[in-house]
Amino acid sequence: MKHSKKLLLCISFLLITVFISGCGSMTKEDNKEEKIKKGFEKTLGMYPIKNLEDLYDKEGYRDEEFDEGDKGTWILYSEMVIQRKGDDLVTRGMILKVNRNTRTSKGNYIINKISTDSKGVSRNTQKKFPVKMENNKIIPIKKIEDSKIKREIDEFKFFAQYANFNSLKDYKNGDIATNPKVPSYSAEYDLENSDYNVKQLRKRYDIPTQQAPKLLLKGTGDLKGSSIGSKDIEFTFIEKPKKNIYFSDSLDYKPSEGH
């Protein structure tokens, strides 16, 4: 009888130990997830930026990489990648550098096409169309003959202009990955088509699938802030061999070039 009681006590102790260890691991993962979300909130909390010219008066995270007197440059980048099954992979996106020193904004509308021939050899074709921003409107710097591309530039909006991440704190049970040696970090979430930002993307792009996407928050550098690191977000609808649909976006604050 005494042996049975001792055995029960040992088993109970082991179960409690395992439970506490499990809770400890969950707490660590929860802390990592919260830190990643807080790191992204500093930028995503600015969305939507309906008037991009507001960035001229908005300062980001500064570190020793900035020269004295440099007000910094905001760099926006948004792109949609669509590859229907068996077709070429086509990327359409824009980069815009908002220089707070000169209060000017220039960039490029970029169309990238990756095709693969019958021998499996890939070929990359890229077209760049210089653009600038005036009165919160993106306009071509050079004359564009192609009416389709001209219309795409005229109608283009950066994700930062219409996205809203007020519900970021409600995203739970993300797939968390960290590498302190790089350092790098990421959090991935399964979204529903009812998600506000997913609906906004479907409204603006012809997305040839009803499959709901995954949201990936990924970055490098110090989570608290770093002009060397980066923070990117991706909405992946489909990721398969010869069939890909995903959207990428970033908003970074960097030292100005040539300052």
From Swiss-Prot:
It holds the Pfam family DUF576. It is a lipid-anchor. The keyword Membrane applies. Keywords: Cell membrane, Lipoprotein, Membrane, Palmitate, Signal. It is found in: Cell membrane. Residues 1-22 form the signal peptide. It comes from the Bacteria. Transmembrane segments: none annotated. A lipid is attached at C23 (S-diacylglycerol cysteine). A lipid is attached at C23 (N-palmitoyl cysteine). One of its GO terms (cellular component) is plasma membrane. PROSITE patterns: PROKAR_LIPOPROTEIN (PS51257). Belongs to the staphylococcal tandem lipoprotein family. This is Uncharacterized lipoprotein SERP2453. It comes from Staphylococcus epidermidis (strain ATCC 35984 / DSM 28319 / BCRC 17069 / CCUG 31568 / BM 3577 / RP62A). The lineage of its organism: Bacteria, Bacillati, Bacillota, Bacilli, Bacillales.
